[in-house]
Amino acid sequence: MHPTTLILSSSLLMIFTLLIYPLITTLTPTPQHKNWALTHVKTAIKMAFLVSLLPLFVFLDQGTETIVTNWQWMNTTTFDINLSFKFDHYSIIFTPIALYVTWSILEFASWYMHADPNMNRFFKYLLLFLIAMIILVTANNMFQLFIGWEGVGIMSFLLIGWWHGRADANTAAMQAVIYNRVGDIGLILSMAWFATNLNSWEIQQMFASSKGLDLTLPLMGLILAATGKSAQFGLHPWLPSAMEGPTPVSALLHSSTMVVAGIFLLIRLHPLMEDNQTALTVCLCLGALTTLFTATCALTQNDIKKIVAFSTSSQLGLMMVTIGLNQPQLAFLHICTHAFFKAMLFLCSGSIIHSLNDEQDIRKMGGMHNLTPSTSSCLTIGSLALTGTPFLAGFFSKDAIIEALNTSHLNAWALTLTLLATSFTAIYSLRVIFFVSMGHPRFTATAPVNENNPSVINPIKRLAWGSIIAGLLITSNFLPTNTPVMTMPTHLKLAALLVTISGLLIALELASLTNKQFKLHPTLTLHNFSNMLGFFPAIIHRLTPKLNLTLGQTIASQMVDHTWFEKVGPKELFQLTCLMVTTTSNIQQGMIKTYLTLFFLSTTLAVLLTLT
């Protein structure tokens, strides 16, 4: 075996061993020590992160991609399923990022969840999720990818409903699993199509044998799968609802890792899509619609976690736009940079929520810059990185995406929506900074504001460093596969920056407008549209069940009771009997001449018929 291949495969084996060891220790009959989460889980993930740097450095030095097939799961005359791992640009970069972010979040969770009696089980769930995510990222066949896909889905369900004593948490968990199940149907049907028509689930073989085939049908299934998992328009309501889970869950699953699985699926299978204009156009338009709609919803939300959740959905829409542009590597770059600052935004939110006695309404915060300077500074850095401030992590990916959009020959509709959404991103990010950090405190003086704990500050600082330098590090070391347009007019080059600055100016104007009321009864149509999430939950979650109930009631009362038991049954029998009675009673009226005439005619007719 080639030394590079040996290093890559043994590193992955070492990572899995380190992550699975704490899970094995839980199988013993004796209960775990109360510090098990810190001594076993956090240490294992820290060590796994350090091990994952080895294949990264080898890849940077050698630039070789490797596929390792270890074991045959199923071997028939026509179909093979192997246990195979793919070490390429995507899996080698994403694995250390996932481990680094998880390490920071778990350290934060040790403080956030310290009073929870089942904290060890919580950490075990997070560890299981991480293993499923790494299986998904490194899989080289669809079956293995599907195992990771379902693994992250079920862990999401368990972690959203962690506080299952609350009805909202149970509802949100059920909602997440149902929406994801719709997406899973698309993935399962696509896999069935690939197995039937391409006779393989190995990704390399699928690429080779799909040349010349019309792949529109399976690609639509894959896009449906990505729509469900990555909260694209139509299947997006589960992501803001998922904020019912603990903040570390939101930071890990619903910002940086699990929600990008749908986008990652499309990136991994992008060679199937690159020549299919239907699939690319669907991705482009769906992503543009998602990024604008969810950014619009974020503008007027008051729950700090909901704002960050909608911003996640908006950034996922931007990644989908990039896939529609035929630029999967840019989408992956945005996944990597987005993971750092979005996880950090959630951790800062969690720290502030905990400090204010579980208060999540930004209108009841304020003045946090003086009370929690480190957390507020990191919140500001994260928000600025999200808006695409030059030289922070988000700038390197967002700017490249908008430049690619500007210089492409695709429809201007998607470009306009994306630029609007980028402007809105600046508005809601500055709104969070304005309400949370600036001004005077708007909460009770008894709030236990305290950030002087290494378990709070260290993870946020680590992610802050990632939010500052990750974009530069990744773009410096990995050359793009598609050469971008190197020369363009100044106004195109500055487009992303200009819409961001205009967004910041609009945000300042809106902030001043919120303190004034020009009319006694102001018209709030646009505000209500944004605040009520475009009336989407009201229509889908209320109107659809109401229509079904009305239909059921109509069938039960109108069709069965009214029609069958009343009209067809008793009344119809009565009408039929009446007709027969009326007919026979009309004959018996004592008209002798008529009877004799009829008798004579009928007799004559009978005789004539007999003679002839």
Curated annotation (Swiss-Prot):
Reactions catalysed: a ubiquinone + NADH + 5 H(+)(in) = a ubiquinol + NAD(+) + 4 H(+)(out)
Positions of transmembrane segments: 4-24, 48-68, 92-112, 127-147, 176-196, 215-235, 247-267, 279-299, 307-327, 330-350, 376-396, 410-430, 463-483, 494-514, 591-611
Uppermost EC category: translocase
Tree of life domain: Eukaryota
Major localization listed first in the record, in broad terms: mitochondrion
One cellular component (GO) term of this entry: mitochondrial inner membrane
Keyword Translocase (UniProt): yes
UniProt entry keywords in alphabetical sequence: Electron transport, Membrane, Mitochondrion, Mitochondrion inner membrane, NAD, Respiratory chain, Translocase, Transmembrane, Transmembrane helix, Transport, Ubiquinone
Role played: Core subunit of the mitochondrial membrane respiratory chain NADH dehydrogenase (Complex I) that is believed to belong to the minimal assembly required for catalysis. Complex I functions in the transfer of electrons from NADH to the respiratory chain. The immediate electron acceptor for the enzyme is believed to be ubiquinone.
Topological category with respect to the lipid bilayer: Multi-pass membrane protein
NCBIfam families with a match to the protein in the record: NDH_I_L
GO biological process: one example: electron transport coupled proton transport
Protein name, UniProt field: NADH-ubiquinone oxidoreductase chain 5
Family from the record: Belongs to the complex I subunit 5 family.
GO MF annotation list: NADH dehydrogenase (ubiquinone) activity
